[in-house]
């Protein structure tokens, strides 16, 4: 997960679970939601309690996904409240995978020194 986002849940009401290879943009808030793998959560987006983001999704910057909303796999979500605007293309799916790899490689380089 890329940072600095914020993940939190409401005890007894919701649980936050983030799947593998998810990229979370700066300032995003994940509050008691489930995000399946290989997805991108855009900068400043807000995911509220008990919403479920399917795998291979892109949640656009600033989107608000309301409580309990279920987003199908391979969906592009934009707006407030967030709405599915279209399906993710094969090219975008490759971009999702590439984005995660770049964040991972960048995070691994922190703390390294060439001497």
Where are these regions (language model features)?
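Terminal amphipathic alpha-helical/low-complexity segments used for targeting or macromolecular assembly
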Residues: 69-75, 80-115
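Structural signal for interior beta-strand "rungs" in well-ordered beta-sheet cores
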Residues: 1-78, 82-84
């Amino acid at each position: 997960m890329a940072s600095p986002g914020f993940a939190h849940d409401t005890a007894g009401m919701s649980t936050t679970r983030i799947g593998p290879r998810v990229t979370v943009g700066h300032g995003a808030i994940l509050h008691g939601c489930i995000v399946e793998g290989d997805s991108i959560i855009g900068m400043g987006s807000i995911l509220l309690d008990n919403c479920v983001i399917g795998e291979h999704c892109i949640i656009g910057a600033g989107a608000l996904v309301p409580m309990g909303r279920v987003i199908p796999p391979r969906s592009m979500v934009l707006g407030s409240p967030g709405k599915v605007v279209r399906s993710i293309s094969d090219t975008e799916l490759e971009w999702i995978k590439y984005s995660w790899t770049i964040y991972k490689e960048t995070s691994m380089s922190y703390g390294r020194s060439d001497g």
